[in-house]
Curated annotation (Swiss-Prot):
Family affiliation: Belongs to the GroES chaperonin family.
Recorded GO MF terms: ATP binding; metal ion binding; protein folding chaperone; protein-folding chaperone binding; unfolded protein binding
Family annotation (Gene3D superfamilies): GroES chaperonin
UniProt function note: Together with the chaperonin GroEL, plays an essential role in assisting protein folding. The GroEL-GroES system forms a nano-cage that allows encapsulation of the non-native substrate proteins and provides a physical environment optimized to promote and accelerate protein folding. GroES binds to the apical surface of the GroEL ring, thereby capping the opening of the GroEL channel.
Gene Ontology cellular-component annotations: cytoplasm
Protein's recorded name: Co-chaperonin GroES
Amino acid sequence: MSIRPLHDRVIVKRKEVETKSAGGIVLTGSAATKSTRGEIIAVGKGRILENGTVQPLDVKVGDIVIFNDGYGVKSEKIDNEEVLIMSESDILAIVEA
């Protein structure tokens, strides 16, 4: 299945988080926090401004981002993989190598 976000929304695949503590203890359950980093796998066409023009997004497919995992972020399963649907405004930063 393919998914195409609308307007200023993006689809993010969450990056796996390290599940061991600094001391080598394996973290499980609530002790293992979910990562707030992910890879952009799809982007919408952009935000529609009041004058009707479309402002393109600053992020692109393949970007690694840090995002706010809050109220506006929707989790969905696509082809048995969890993806996150969010607005570009939920993205805090692009990780540059």
